Amino acid sequence: MKKIAVLTSGGDSPGMNAAVRAVVRTAIYNEIEVYGVYHGYQGLLNDDIHKLELGSVGDTIQRGGTFLYSARCPEFKEQEVRKVAIENLRKRGIEGLVVIGGDGSYRGAQRISEECKEIQTIGIPGTIDNDINGTDFTIGFDTALNTIIGLVDKIRDTASSHARTFIIEAMGRDCGDLALWAGLSVGAETIVVPEVKTDIKEIADKIEQGIKRGKKHSIVLVAEGCMTAQDCQKELSQFINVDNRVSVLGHVQRGGSPTGADRVLASRLGGYAVDLLMQGETAKGVGIKNNKIVATSFDEIFDGKDHKFDYSLYELANKLSI
Protein backbone atom coordinates (compact mmCIF):
# COMPACT_ATOMS: atom_id res chain seq x y z
CA MET A 1 0.00 0.00 0.00
CA LYS A 2 1.41 3.35 -1.07
CA LYS A 3 -1.41 5.89 -0.68
CA ILE A 4 -4.33 6.26 1.72
CA ALA A 5 -6.90 8.96 2.53
CA VAL A 6 -8.68 9.95 5.72
CA LEU A 7 -11.92 11.85 6.30
CA THR A 8 -14.19 12.84 9.17
CA SER A 9 -17.93 12.58 8.70
CA GLY A 10 -21.20 13.22 10.51
CA GLY A 11 -21.42 15.01 13.83
CA ASP A 12 -18.03 16.12 15.10
CA SER A 13 -16.58 14.82 18.36
CA PRO A 14 -13.57 15.77 20.51
CA GLY A 15 -10.65 13.51 19.64
CA MET A 16 -11.26 13.35 15.89
CA ASN A 17 -8.14 15.45 15.32
CA ALA A 18 -6.11 13.10 17.49
CA ALA A 19 -7.36 10.17 15.40
CA VAL A 20 -6.46 11.91 12.12
CA ARG A 21 -3.03 12.71 13.55
CA ALA A 22 -2.47 9.05 14.44
CA VAL A 23 -3.54 7.91 10.97
CA VAL A 24 -1.27 10.41 9.23
CA ARG A 25 1.81 9.81 11.35
CA THR A 26 1.46 6.01 11.40
CA ALA A 27 1.13 6.01 7.62
CA ILE A 28 4.11 8.32 7.04
CA TYR A 29 6.17 6.25 9.50
CA ASN A 30 5.46 3.30 7.19
CA GLU A 31 6.32 5.33 4.06
CA ILE A 32 2.70 5.67 2.93
CA GLU A 33 1.41 8.91 1.40
CA VAL A 34 -1.65 10.34 3.16
CA TYR A 35 -4.39 12.54 1.75
CA GLY A 36 -6.95 14.46 3.76
CA VAL A 37 -10.49 14.64 2.43
CA TYR A 38 -12.00 17.94 3.55
CA HIS A 39 -15.72 18.25 4.42
CA GLY A 40 -16.38 14.52 4.69
CA TYR A 41 -18.10 12.63 1.88
CA GLN A 42 -19.07 15.94 0.32
CA GLY A 43 -15.36 16.58 -0.11
CA LEU A 44 -14.98 13.25 -1.90
CA LEU A 45 -17.62 14.36 -4.39
CA ASN A 46 -16.11 17.83 -4.79
CA ASP A 47 -12.57 16.46 -5.14
CA ASP A 48 -11.52 18.44 -2.06
CA ILE A 49 -8.60 16.09 -1.41
CA HIS A 50 -5.13 17.29 -0.40
CA LYS A 51 -1.87 15.65 0.59
CA LEU A 52 -1.02 15.77 4.30
CA GLU A 53 2.47 15.94 5.75
CA LEU A 54 3.78 15.47 9.29
CA GLY A 55 3.40 19.18 9.91
CA SER A 56 -0.22 19.10 8.74
CA VAL A 57 -1.22 17.40 11.97
CA GLY A 58 1.12 19.30 14.28
CA ASP A 59 -0.57 21.10 17.17
CA THR A 60 -3.86 19.24 16.62
CA ILE A 61 -3.97 16.54 19.30
CA GLN A 62 -5.37 18.97 21.88
CA ARG A 63 -7.92 20.61 19.59
CA GLY A 64 -11.60 19.80 19.62
CA GLY A 65 -13.65 19.49 16.45
CA THR A 66 -11.99 18.38 13.22
CA PHE A 67 -9.58 20.42 11.11
CA LEU A 68 -10.68 18.34 8.11
CA TYR A 69 -14.20 19.68 8.66
CA SER A 70 -17.33 17.59 8.45
CA ALA A 71 -20.56 17.75 6.49
CA ARG A 72 -23.75 15.81 5.95
CA CYS A 73 -23.99 14.28 2.48
CA PRO A 74 -27.34 12.48 1.99
CA GLU A 75 -26.79 12.21 -1.77
CA PHE A 76 -23.92 9.77 -1.10
CA LYS A 77 -26.61 7.09 -0.77
CA GLU A 78 -26.97 7.20 -4.56
CA GLN A 79 -24.68 4.88 -6.52
CA GLU A 80 -24.08 7.31 -9.37
CA VAL A 81 -22.88 9.89 -6.86
CA ARG A 82 -20.57 7.36 -5.21
CA LYS A 83 -19.00 6.58 -8.59
CA VAL A 84 -17.76 10.17 -8.76
CA ALA A 85 -16.26 9.92 -5.27
CA ILE A 86 -14.58 6.60 -6.03
CA GLU A 87 -13.07 7.98 -9.23
CA ASN A 88 -11.63 10.94 -7.31
CA LEU A 89 -9.79 8.46 -5.10
CA ARG A 90 -8.71 6.14 -7.92
CA LYS A 91 -7.21 8.86 -10.10
CA ARG A 92 -4.77 9.64 -7.28
CA GLY A 93 -3.89 5.99 -6.79
CA ILE A 94 -5.41 5.91 -3.30
CA GLU A 95 -5.80 2.32 -2.14
CA GLY A 96 -7.15 2.78 1.38
CA LEU A 97 -9.69 5.06 3.04
CA VAL A 98 -10.05 5.66 6.78
CA VAL A 99 -13.44 7.06 7.76
CA ILE A 100 -13.91 8.61 11.21
CA GLY A 101 -17.54 8.99 12.23
CA GLY A 102 -20.68 7.17 13.23
CA ASP A 103 -23.04 4.58 11.80
CA GLY A 104 -23.92 6.53 8.65
CA SER A 105 -20.25 7.20 7.96
CA TYR A 106 -19.52 3.48 8.24
CA ARG A 107 -22.27 2.67 5.74
CA GLY A 108 -20.72 5.02 3.21
CA ALA A 109 -17.35 3.31 3.68
CA GLN A 110 -18.92 -0.11 3.24
CA ARG A 111 -20.50 0.95 -0.06
CA ILE A 112 -17.12 2.13 -1.36
CA SER A 113 -15.46 -1.19 -0.47
CA GLU A 114 -18.30 -3.12 -2.13
CA GLU A 115 -18.32 -1.08 -5.32
CA CYS A 116 -14.56 -0.73 -5.75
CA LYS A 117 -12.46 -3.71 -4.67
CA GLU A 118 -9.29 -1.67 -5.29
CA ILE A 119 -10.04 0.56 -2.30
CA GLN A 120 -9.93 -0.84 1.22
CA THR A 121 -11.96 0.93 3.91
CA ILE A 122 -11.61 1.04 7.70
CA GLY A 123 -13.92 2.88 10.10
CA ILE A 124 -13.02 4.61 13.37
CA PRO A 125 -15.90 5.34 15.81
CA GLY A 126 -16.06 9.10 16.28
CA THR A 127 -19.23 10.30 18.01
CA ILE A 128 -20.11 11.61 21.46
CA ASP A 129 -23.23 9.41 21.51
CA ASN A 130 -21.38 6.14 22.24
CA ASP A 131 -23.89 4.29 20.08
CA ILE A 132 -21.66 2.23 17.77
CA ASN A 133 -21.49 -1.56 17.90
CA GLY A 134 -18.05 -3.16 17.92
CA THR A 135 -16.63 -0.92 20.63
CA ASP A 136 -17.24 -0.22 24.31
CA PHE A 137 -16.47 3.47 23.86
CA THR A 138 -16.46 5.92 20.96
CA ILE A 139 -14.04 8.80 20.50
CA GLY A 140 -15.55 11.90 22.09
CA PHE A 141 -17.81 10.19 24.60
CA ASP A 142 -15.51 10.73 27.57
CA THR A 143 -14.99 14.41 26.75
CA ALA A 144 -18.72 15.02 26.29
CA LEU A 145 -19.38 13.19 29.56
CA ASN A 146 -16.96 15.44 31.41
CA THR A 147 -18.47 18.51 29.75
CA ILE A 148 -21.94 17.52 30.93
CA ILE A 149 -20.66 16.84 34.44
CA GLY A 150 -19.09 20.31 34.62
CA LEU A 151 -22.24 22.01 33.34
CA VAL A 152 -24.63 20.12 35.61
CA ASP A 153 -22.41 20.79 38.63
CA LYS A 154 -22.76 24.50 37.88
CA ILE A 155 -26.51 24.22 37.36
CA ARG A 156 -26.82 22.41 40.69
CA ASP A 157 -25.24 25.42 42.40
CA THR A 158 -28.01 27.71 41.20
CA ALA A 159 -30.68 25.03 41.71
CA SER A 160 -29.60 24.84 45.35
CA SER A 161 -29.57 28.62 45.76
CA HIS A 162 -33.16 28.97 44.52
CA ALA A 163 -34.54 25.63 45.78
CA ARG A 164 -35.52 24.61 42.25
CA THR A 165 -35.87 21.44 40.24
CA PHE A 166 -33.86 21.54 37.01
CA ILE A 167 -34.78 19.36 34.03
CA ILE A 168 -31.63 19.07 31.93
CA GLU A 169 -31.48 17.63 28.41
CA ALA A 170 -28.35 15.80 27.25
CA MET A 171 -27.42 14.61 23.75
CA GLY A 172 -27.05 10.98 22.72
CA ARG A 173 -29.59 10.45 19.92
CA ASP A 174 -31.27 7.09 20.63
CA CYS A 175 -28.60 6.01 23.13
CA GLY A 176 -28.91 6.89 26.82
CA ASP A 177 -25.24 6.40 27.73
CA LEU A 178 -24.38 10.09 28.08
CA ALA A 179 -27.37 10.75 30.34
CA LEU A 180 -26.74 7.57 32.34
CA TRP A 181 -23.04 8.06 32.96
CA ALA A 182 -23.43 11.78 33.60
CA GLY A 183 -26.46 11.23 35.82
CA LEU A 184 -24.57 8.79 38.01
CA SER A 185 -21.55 11.10 38.11
CA VAL A 186 -23.49 14.20 39.22
CA GLY A 187 -25.87 12.43 41.59
CA ALA A 188 -28.98 13.22 39.56
CA GLU A 189 -32.20 12.41 41.38
CA THR A 190 -33.70 10.95 38.19
CA ILE A 191 -32.27 9.77 34.87
CA VAL A 192 -34.59 9.48 31.86
CA VAL A 193 -33.26 7.32 29.00
CA PRO A 194 -34.77 5.65 25.90
CA GLU A 195 -33.77 2.17 27.07
CA VAL A 196 -35.99 2.27 30.18
CA LYS A 197 -39.73 2.98 30.13
CA THR A 198 -40.38 6.35 31.71
CA ASP A 199 -43.06 6.74 34.39
CA ILE A 200 -43.49 10.47 34.94
CA LYS A 201 -45.60 9.93 38.05
CA GLU A 202 -42.75 7.93 39.61
CA ILE A 203 -40.38 10.82 38.90
CA ALA A 204 -42.83 13.25 40.49
CA ASP A 205 -43.23 10.99 43.53
CA LYS A 206 -39.46 10.75 43.93
CA ILE A 207 -39.09 14.54 43.84
CA GLU A 208 -41.92 14.89 46.36
CA GLN A 209 -40.36 12.37 48.72
CA GLY A 210 -37.13 14.35 48.59
CA ILE A 211 -38.97 17.57 49.46
CA LYS A 212 -40.67 15.88 52.43
CA ARG A 213 -37.32 14.89 53.90
CA GLY A 214 -36.00 18.42 53.52
CA LYS A 215 -34.41 18.34 50.07
CA LYS A 216 -34.41 21.80 48.51
CA HIS A 217 -33.59 21.00 44.88
CA SER A 218 -33.50 18.16 42.34
CA ILE A 219 -31.78 17.34 39.06
CA VAL A 220 -33.67 15.41 36.37
CA LEU A 221 -31.33 14.41 33.52
CA VAL A 222 -33.13 13.57 30.27
CA ALA A 223 -31.63 11.88 27.20
CA GLU A 224 -32.76 13.63 24.01
CA GLY A 225 -33.73 10.31 22.40
CA CYS A 226 -36.36 9.72 25.06
CA MET A 227 -38.14 13.07 25.24
CA THR A 228 -37.32 16.74 25.26
CA ALA A 229 -36.73 18.52 28.53
CA GLN A 230 -39.74 20.74 27.73
CA ASP A 231 -42.01 17.71 27.29
CA CYS A 232 -40.73 16.25 30.54
CA GLN A 233 -41.48 19.56 32.27
CA LYS A 234 -45.05 19.63 30.92
CA GLU A 235 -45.76 16.05 31.97
CA LEU A 236 -44.25 16.55 35.42
CA SER A 237 -46.46 19.59 36.01
CA GLN A 238 -49.50 17.31 35.85
CA PHE A 239 -48.36 15.48 38.98
CA ILE A 240 -46.34 17.94 41.06
CA ASN A 241 -46.20 21.69 41.59
CA VAL A 242 -42.57 22.71 42.13
CA ASP A 243 -40.51 25.67 41.01
CA ASN A 244 -38.58 24.30 38.02
CA ARG A 245 -36.48 25.32 35.06
CA VAL A 246 -35.42 23.64 31.81
CA SER A 247 -31.85 23.61 30.50
CA VAL A 248 -30.96 22.15 27.10
CA LEU A 249 -27.18 21.70 27.04
CA GLY A 250 -27.01 21.57 23.24
CA HIS A 251 -23.92 21.66 21.03
CA VAL A 252 -21.54 22.70 23.79
CA GLN A 253 -21.40 18.93 24.48
CA ARG A 254 -19.61 18.38 21.15
CA GLY A 255 -16.89 20.93 21.72
CA GLY A 256 -13.82 21.38 23.85
CA SER A 257 -10.33 19.96 24.11
CA PRO A 258 -10.46 16.14 24.30
CA THR A 259 -9.75 14.44 27.59
CA GLY A 260 -6.67 12.28 28.06
CA ALA A 261 -8.83 9.18 27.70
CA ASP A 262 -10.16 10.33 24.32
CA ARG A 263 -6.70 11.33 23.08
CA VAL A 264 -5.27 7.93 23.98
CA LEU A 265 -8.23 6.05 22.49
CA ALA A 266 -8.08 8.09 19.28
CA SER A 267 -4.34 7.52 18.95
CA ARG A 268 -4.68 3.77 19.48
CA LEU A 269 -7.55 3.40 17.02
CA GLY A 270 -5.96 5.66 14.38
CA GLY A 271 -2.71 3.73 14.43
CA TYR A 272 -4.51 0.38 14.33
CA ALA A 273 -6.63 1.47 11.35
CA VAL A 274 -3.47 1.98 9.29
CA ASP A 275 -2.06 -1.35 10.49
CA LEU A 276 -5.21 -3.09 9.24
CA LEU A 277 -4.97 -1.45 5.81
CA MET A 278 -1.35 -2.59 5.54
CA GLN A 279 -2.49 -6.13 6.38
CA GLY A 280 -5.01 -6.04 3.51
CA GLU A 281 -8.10 -5.79 5.72
CA THR A 282 -11.18 -3.93 4.51
CA ALA A 283 -14.79 -3.13 5.45
CA LYS A 284 -14.07 -3.21 9.16
CA GLY A 285 -14.49 -0.87 12.09
CA VAL A 286 -11.93 -0.62 14.87
CA GLY A 287 -12.86 -0.31 18.51
CA ILE A 288 -11.94 -1.04 22.10
CA LYS A 289 -13.47 -3.97 23.98
CA ASN A 290 -12.36 -4.95 27.47
CA ASN A 291 -9.45 -2.52 26.98
CA LYS A 292 -8.24 -4.41 23.90
CA ILE A 293 -8.16 -2.88 20.42
CA VAL A 294 -10.28 -4.98 18.07
CA ALA A 295 -11.61 -4.98 14.51
CA THR A 296 -15.17 -5.96 13.59
CA SER A 297 -16.66 -6.30 10.10
CA PHE A 298 -19.12 -3.63 9.07
CA ASP A 299 -21.78 -6.33 8.59
CA GLU A 300 -21.38 -7.45 12.20
CA ILE A 301 -21.42 -3.84 13.41
CA PHE A 302 -24.67 -3.10 11.56
CA ASP A 303 -26.34 -6.36 12.64
CA GLY A 304 -24.79 -6.62 16.09
CA LYS A 305 -26.21 -5.92 19.51
CA ASP A 306 -22.95 -6.05 21.44
CA HIS A 307 -23.07 -2.42 22.53
CA LYS A 308 -25.74 -2.83 25.17
CA PHE A 309 -27.16 -0.38 27.65
CA ASP A 310 -25.72 -1.02 31.12
CA TYR A 311 -28.84 -1.71 33.16
CA SER A 312 -26.75 -2.53 36.23
CA LEU A 313 -25.34 1.00 36.12
CA TYR A 314 -28.86 2.38 35.79
CA GLU A 315 -30.00 0.39 38.83
CA LEU A 316 -26.98 1.61 40.80
CA ALA A 317 -27.82 5.22 39.94
CA ASN A 318 -31.38 4.64 41.16
CA LYS A 319 -30.19 3.14 44.44
CA LEU A 320 -27.78 5.98 45.10
CA SER A 321 -30.33 8.70 44.36
CA ILE A 322 -32.83 7.77 47.09
From Swiss-Prot:
Q: Which residues bind Mg(2+)?
A: 103
What domain of life? Answer: Bacteria
Is the keyword Membrane assigned to this protein?
Answer: no
Which compartments is it annotated to reside in? Cytoplasm
Q: Which reaction does it catalyse?
A: beta-D-fructose 6-phosphate + ATP = beta-D-fructose 1,6-bisphosphate + ADP + H(+)
**EC number(s) given by UniProt:** 2.7.1.11
- Designated name of the protein: ATP-dependent 6-phosphofructokinase
Q: Which organism is it from?
A: Staphylococcus aureus (strain MRSA252)
Q: What is the lineage of its organism?
A: Bacteria, Bacillati, Bacillota, Bacilli, Bacillales
Q: Give the encoding gene's name.
A: pfkA
